[in-house]
Amino acid sequence: MKFQKAVITGLVFILLLWIPGMAFAGGSSYKADTKYPIVLAHGMGASAEILGIVDYWWGIPGALRDEGATVYITSVNGMDSTRNKANAFKTQFLQIKAVTGAAKLNIIGHSHGTVYTRDAISNLGLYPYVASHSSIAGPHRGSAVADVVVGIVPNSLEWLVGDTLDFIYAFLFGDTNPNSLQNGYDMTRPYMINTFNPNTPNKSGVYYQSWAARIKTMAVNARNWYFIATWPILLYHEGANDGLVSVTSAQWGNFRGTEDASWYSAGCDHLNIVDQLFGYTPGFDAGTFYVDLAADLKARGY
């Protein structure tokens, strides 16, 4: 009996030494446990929660956390100037950095969230603390949709349109002193190409990468019907697009490609790429897309 106990004790001791060693040798079993925490930055027209009910990123944070990622979600005004959003983002970014104690953070932005984060990095001094900037469907060269919308509003009515939108966003979304009109101007192609980009250069030491999304087909009864007016405008002026941003405009830094879902689908639109509406896009799994993105950052040492 004593001999059996000794054998069992010895085996348990060996297992206790062997199992951690195997884990160490094989590395983490998680795909998305990046070296630096991930910070998500939402786009124009919404905050971290749409109408205070629907999560902007839907199931993406959960998918990342399930694979070991440390994820933080920032929230700025839905409608405001790029600079105002950048300032608000900077404040939250530094708070996250302080809480985590991390030397740097990885930024993943969508839509306007790719632009105001660039402003915060290059012009507001965040670049020493940013490991990577991943852009998802970002209007880096503006959008013809913004050009058209701004262009059709008569100068005499700009104040009325702007004030009306500001009231809506302050009342429904809880924005603080929003500036909808300026947000529209900041997304126009002339401003982005001639003013913003020349004054917002990429910073050395920050890894920049980007993805675009693309709608392949459009019909009144299609599930992407909400872009039935904007998709053809962009198609005419800029070519392939996701309903709000063209593939060309979305390219920034290391362009990783265009997500258009499986062959049998209508494509991947500007909302699908962040798991909307409500996490259902035939032929596209947003959770997997972002986990793979994080896994790639991990492999690159970020």
Pin down the residues of each PLM region.
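Active-site catalytic motif of lipid deacylating hydrolases and related acyltransferases
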Residues: 29-105
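Solvent-exposed loop/turn segments at secondary-structure junctions
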Residues: 43-47, 77-81, 110-115, 138-142, ...
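C-terminal catalytic-base region of ester-bond hydrolases, centering on the histidine
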Residues: 198-302
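Serine-dependent carboxylesterase/thioesterase catalytic core
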Residues: 42, 87-187, 242
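Bacterial N-terminal signal peptides
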Residues: 10-19
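Sec/Tat signal peptide C-region and signal peptidase I cleavage site
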Residues: 19-25
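Bacterial N-terminal signal peptides that target proteins for export
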Residues: 1-10
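Short aromatic-enriched loop/helix-cap "lid" or pocket-rim segments at secondary-structure transitions
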Residues: 52, 144-149, 219-225
